[in-house]
């Protein structure tokens, strides 16, 4: 009887390992929260040392400090009303989130790509909706 219990417990542990790995590779909830609040300082805590940024006419790879300034400027000019997460997923070590950012000046499509809980790419583009 102990052998059966031990085998069953081992089987359950082995099955749960892929689930734990998938959980850890999602876009951090703090990123979603920072977008919803329009908080560039909170978002900067998740930026990689260099991040590909597409916001307005800014389209390049920027240092964390430069990217934080550009994001803060965007949030100053476009006060955030809400952020709605539309889709998220992951593959290998990367994860992504796609959503709609509603601001006082219009709606924007947001795409976030992360690796190891750090934002590698952030795109905020005017939505056609």
Question: What spans do the regions from the language model cover?
Answer:
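Short solvent-exposed beta->alpha transition segments
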Residues: 26, 47-82
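Short, aromatic-enriched amphipathic alpha-helices that serve as compact interaction elements
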Residues: 24-39
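Solenoid-repeat scaffolds in large eukaryotic assemblies
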Residues: 42-43
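Short, flexible beta-strand-to-coil junctions
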Residues: 56-58, 103-104, 115
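Surface-exposed, charged secondary-structure patches
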Residues: 69-107
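Short beta-strand edge/turn micro-motifs at domain boundaries
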Residues: 107-129
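Bacterial Sec-dependent N-terminal signal peptides
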Residues: 1-26
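A generic structural motif
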Residues: 54, 100-102, 127
